[in-house]
């Protein structure tokens, strides 16, 4: 299968090329040139698969056995999920009043990003060992991506990872999960800015195509196609767990509620919908509501500033995966997508063309949820079920409660739960509840930390480039010594 840039200028690449890229050289994001179509028979066959089984089928569909033979692919995916705490890897909790919560947080760092990052890192290691190459991974994080990326890469002999975290804008636990990893190939920077601000030096570095090529740079943020590919399995598993039957014509709809920051899970869900999965998508955001405004009014524009909320991993103003959604909505029209995104980058504001907005609002519903509603939802879920939600999961569950309180017709619904409440004791306390903290999270408090500060006024881009150049020098020296 071939992958093309949403902006249509960069040459097409195979899965390996997309895997090792951040942004495409023309500033776009890689997408499959053609989407396969799944028929009813395939969906029925897949309906009995485990979550890892679905990941295997989806990856085989989008990678191609000539690049990665099926048995080797299956081994890599088994290895990726070997350290998850739940035997199902992903678990559905069926609670009162039709509330279905899909727990995506049974990995090492208690967040959904463990799922896609553990697989992506296995794919990277496979190709790096085959090609005898080294890469430097650069990640900007609002909280969970950084720790999951570090966990999946730490100690890998062919990879270094640089993580930029927003100092004071993620929770103490999230920060400790990153700064307590002291492996030689892990390099953490604490940035005096928010997650959108720290994305700027990263985007600038990736825009220098010669620099990226020279130093084998890549990203593990959800701009990486492999992340989106694995996340498609969330939607298939949600559907098969919640659909009442596969015997009806047409197949029944299931509503999937997606707590959304950078929109990787939304892009994955929309692709799943496009290839034949009968789901209705609901985007649930906090007060950083750019996607909600885009769905409701076609207004894809920045607010004055990022608002700090209890659902801190979603405190994002620039949901870069919307570019993938726009490209799909436009019928893979790279000219339309490029014009939209270049205008947004220039002016921070775009009004979607009428036809595009109409297609978006047909495909996706949206809701924006305040901190007060988050804590009320956490409290209600505990009162009704003795079940603790993280604040991000509560954003999704709030939509479910709105629907049942209005006595809306009951389509089966699944709320994606991206993180464990254990990672957000501050939010649990704000909801008037008692945090439950696992021993391995408590232990973080007593570990040594390592983090380099990027202060306001420092040249963040230069600091990042210098670090990358140092790592390249060290790798070249190591490779030379090994060959001698």
UniProtKB/Swiss-Prot annotation:
Its EC number is 4.2.3.-. It comes from the Eukaryota. It holds the Pfam family Thr_synth_N. The modification N6-(pyridoxal phosphate)lysine is found at residue 113. One of its GO terms (biological process) is 2-oxobutyrate biosynthetic process. It is an enzyme of class 4 (lyase). One of its GO terms (molecular function) is cytokine activity. NCBIfam families: thrC. Belongs to the threonine synthase family. This is Threonine synthase-like 2. It comes from Homo sapiens (Human). The lineage of its organism: Eukaryota, Metazoa, Chordata, Craniata, Vertebrata.
